[in-house]
Amino acid sequence: MSKKTVVVGLSGGVDSSVAALLLKQQGWNVIGLFMKNWEDDDTEEYCSSRQDLIDVMSVADKIGIDVEVVNFAAEYRERVFAEFLSEYQAGRTPNPDILCNSEIKFKAFLDHAMQLGAEKIATGHYAGVREFDGKFQLLKAEDGTKDQSYFLYRLNQAQLSKTLFPLADIYKRDVRKIAEAEGLHVAAKKDSTGICFIGERPFKDFLSRYLPPKKGEIRRLDDGKVMGEHDGLMFHTMGQRKGLHIGGIKEKGHPGGGDHDAWFVAGKDMEKNVLYVVQGHDHPALLKGDLVAEQLSWVSGNEPHTHWVYTAKPRYRTSDQPCEVERVDAESCEIRFAEPQWALTPGQSVVLYESRVCLGGGVIR
């Protein structure tokens, strides 16, 4: 009986390397696929794709699998990067990794894998998938500190039905141990962080290449007093503290703030090009008990129940927050939290959970 084929997305990191290794050990015919999604900056010091490809080839040779290199740069620019720029231009703070997953890694990559005759695709994401009651569920990973289901909430039934997540039940520390035991040189390789196409370069420098910055006033939200000058609204996001250059100003008697309390971004007026700030982490303007989300995507294809207790992540690095869905239709949904949330950020995604099951979510308005 011939082996079933799985195409594994290899990034050059330890997670995808171990995912490929485990599938090989489980008896799959494994093909590695290295995706090249960005190509303008390959000569620059910040781009790591060359070294990543070298690492992929080394790992593939060690575990005995073939690797194909595929260029999805055109698809990436059209489906992910154009949206990224559009969102920043509109004053929001997008999360391109979410779009990259649904449009590139689990669409362009999936289509290519199927053309190669594969039954499944696999990645090194920390998440799980299971079939339950005739539907495929997206699950949180066993390692809660590394769980990446937040970034995968836009995956649909067709995508999940073809997907394997070999690291679903494995802790990161054990992934590194497996790599070390098998002699994979990427065992101690540092995790990649930040937005993939920006790499380690300064964000402001990168964005300025594509969107011309426009200076404007920084005003205090409470009374409109001018506090300074910003170098472009797109460089600032809700709750931001660093980079405002107004930290030394003493102001008394404003909600949430004392004499020396830090200043935080509390809003933007795109038409007037004004950045609004407040003093103090606990200023009421930074706390909100509800939100409206748009561009909804539900994993099962079914909307969540209204007035049912769920949990939600209004940003990636936050603990699950108890909430209810007040209203939901095809266009938007309203989510009310049990406790006010700090610095809810337009453009970021809010993702809904029922226990370990990721239900889906949308983009905060």
From Swiss-Prot:
Record GO cellular component, one term: cytoplasm
Classification via InterPro entries: MnmA-like, MnmA-like_C, MnmA-like_central, MnmA-like_central_sf, Rossmann-like_a/b/a_fold
Region called Interaction with target base in tRNA, residue ranges: 95-97
UniProt-annotated binding residues for ATP: 9-16, 35, 124
UniProt-annotated site: Interaction with tRNA, residues: 125, 348
Keyword Nucleotide-binding: yes
Residue positions of the active site: 100 (nucleophile), 196 (cysteine persulfide intermediate)
UniProt GO MF annotations: ATP binding; tRNA binding; tRNA-uridine 2-sulfurtransferase activity
Disulfide bonds listed in the record: 100-196
Function: Catalyzes the 2-thiolation of uridine at the wobble position (U34) of tRNA, leading to the formation of s(2)U34.
Family indicated by similarity: Belongs to the MnmA/TRMU family.
Protein name (Swiss-Prot/TrEMBL): tRNA-specific 2-thiouridylase MnmA
Gene expressing this chain: mnmA
